[in-house]
Regions:
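Conserved "HGTGT" condensation-loop signature of ketosynthase/thiolase-family condensing enzymes
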Residues: 1-192, 202, 206-213, 217-369
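Active-site-adjacent substructure of cysteine-protease-like catalytic cores
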Residues: 198
Length: 369
């Protein structure tokens, strides 16, 4: 095209020179105009290319920033979950065939009393050793107690104050009012101090009129900084949970897409635990599939975990139990969790230490520290 333009300009200049009988040096004018235009186009092209490269670099930096934000994690140092006999944690986790039941199971009561208060010595006894182990880490301990009401909290507080003294552990004990916000604060402040324990126990008020299967869960968290500096054991990492609004379908689909793009980038999901009705669970999994999430369909292990058919009816607040079961489920590496609260789906990912994502986490810790 440019050569054609040059030829046309040269022919036009030649006609003018012959017609007006002027100096043949005027034939160089088209060449100069053509060269200037070509140079201008070259400079413009280079500027556009540089701008495009700069924009691609900026987009890449933005994506990396959001990916780093979405994949920021805290450390799960330890966990312990107990269920009443004859329930078996492995059977509940793997959803073993033949393990389904509709019965309710309770912890033993002290002195054959039915009230729930007579059951807490049995439960607390199971966590005495876990509380004792915290003394080995030589870190400030904060125990956050999840209880259905103030009376239950005060009973647990008294019991744990006693066993903390016996175990030689200096612990600050407080009620857990908003665990979702608390974990969000821990993730945001990756250098928060000390060890934080979430303890959740649900016992029926009257064993003779039980409403759910009883359970108790112990989750020990620390910051990546504290875990590295104090050489704490790392059982898994908990990736930043997010809240997805359930009231706006368009915003919900967009949020699932962003979660797939950033939080689950380059990751395969091995299991999903949603404390939600089955219809809602299938909907969430479907939206994640549509968003491009990669699923590991290993038929030897369940992809969608629903503990309730194997434990019997669970209490309304069973999400800490879900995290406890996930922590024990080390055979599946990247595990999604989600529960409904206040019109939102609170969703995150627990990553066990034998996964590639865990290696990525260690690299991140080295950079941070």
């Amino acid at each position: 095209v440019w050569l054609t333009v040059l030829a046309l300009l040269f022919i036009a200049a030649l006609i003018v020179v012959l017609w007006l009988k002027i100096s043949p040096f005027y034939l160089l004018i088209p060449v100069g105009v053509w060269g200037a235009a070509l140079l201008y186009r070259f400079i413009l092209s280079m500027n556009r290319s540089a701008a495009a490269d700069a924009w691609e670099t900026e987009k890449s930096n933005i994506r990396k920033k959001w990916t780093d934000w979405a994949q920021r994690s805290i450390v799960l140092v330890d966990s312990h979950t107990i269920l009443p006999e004859p329930l078996s944690l492995p059977d509940v986790i793997t959803q073993a065939s033949g393990g389904r039941n509709a019965d309710l199971f309770l912890f033993p009561r002290d002195e054959d009393e039915d009230l729930w208060r007579s059951g807490y010595p049995y439960v607390a006894e199971h966590f005495y050793q876990k509380l004792s182990e915290l003394a080995e880490y030589r870190q400030p301990v904060t125990l956050h107690i999840d209880a259905p009401d103030e009376e239950a909290y005060l009973n647990w507080q008294q019991r744990f104050e006693e066993i903390a003294e016996m175990a030689g552990v200096r612990a600050t004990i407080k009620p857990l009012s908003d665990g979702e916000s608390l974990m969000g604060d821990w993730v945001e402040n990756r250098q928060f101090e000390g060890i934080h324990v979430i303890f959740s126990a649900w016992l029926n008020e009257d064993a003779s009129d039980a409403e759910f299967t009883e359970n108790a869960t112990w989750l020990v968290f620390a910051s990546p900084y504290a875990a590295k500096q104090n050489k704490l054991p790392v059982k898994a990492v908990l990736q930043r949970p997010i809240a997805i609004s359930l009231s706006d379908e368009t915003a919900q689909n967009k949020a699932f897409g962003h979660y797939a793009d950033y939080a689950l980038k380059n990751r395969t999901v091995h299991a999903a635990w949603f404390t939600a009705p089955p219809k809602d669970t299938q909907q969430y999994v479907g939206k994640l599939r549509q968003a491009g999430v990669s699923w590991n369909d290993n038929f030897d292990l369940p992809l969608i975990h629903t503990p309730e058919p194997y434990t019997g009816q669970l209490p309304r607040e069973s999400h800490w139990l879900t995290l406890g079961l996930m922590a024990e489920n080390s055979d599946q590496q990247n595990q999604l969790f989600g529960w409904q609260k206040d019109g939102n789906l609170y969703m995150g990912c627990l990553i066990h230490q034998n996964s590639v994502a865990y290696a990525d986490y260690l690299i991140t810790v080295r950079k941070v520290v």
